[in-house]
């Protein structure tokens, strides 16, 4: 794998749009927003984004209705079997 095939960044993802959803759907919407944001900024399909369980735990930490307003994520884009893949985990 060459250096051009691998890219890693720490990204702050705003989740305030999840507040537009009803209380019982906010954490679900936050997970959708995270996947959409990473797909857009790393130029891959949403299906090619793999999220670590730590991101799910951070989005759901305060319950379904009280999602965080933003989340910091460390994401890496690389080539696997000719396709671009993004793997993400929470940044500490």
Curated annotation (Swiss-Prot):
Classification via PROSITE patterns: RIBOSOMAL_L31E
Gene Ontology CC: cytosolic large ribosomal subunit
Gene Ontology molecular functions: rRNA binding; structural constituent of ribosome
BP GO annotations: cytoplasmic translation
Function: Binds to the 23S rRNA. Located at the polypeptide exit tunnel on the outside of the subunit.
UniProt subunit comment: Part of the 50S ribosomal subunit.
Protein name: Large ribosomal subunit protein eL31
Lineage: Archaea, Methanobacteriati, Methanobacteriota, Stenosarchaea group, Halobacteria
């Amino acid at each position: 794998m060459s250096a051009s095939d691998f890219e890693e960044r720490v990204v702050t993802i705003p989740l305030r749009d999840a507040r537009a959803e009803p209380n019982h759907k906010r954490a679900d919407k936050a997970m959708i927003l995270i996947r959409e944001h990473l797909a857009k900024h790393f130029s891959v399909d949403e299906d090619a984004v793999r999220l670590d369980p730590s991101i799910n735990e951070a989005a759901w930490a305060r319950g379904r209705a009280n999602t965080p307003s933003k989340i910091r994520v460390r994401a890496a884009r690389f080539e696997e079997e000719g396709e671009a893949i993004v793997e993400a985990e929470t940044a500490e």
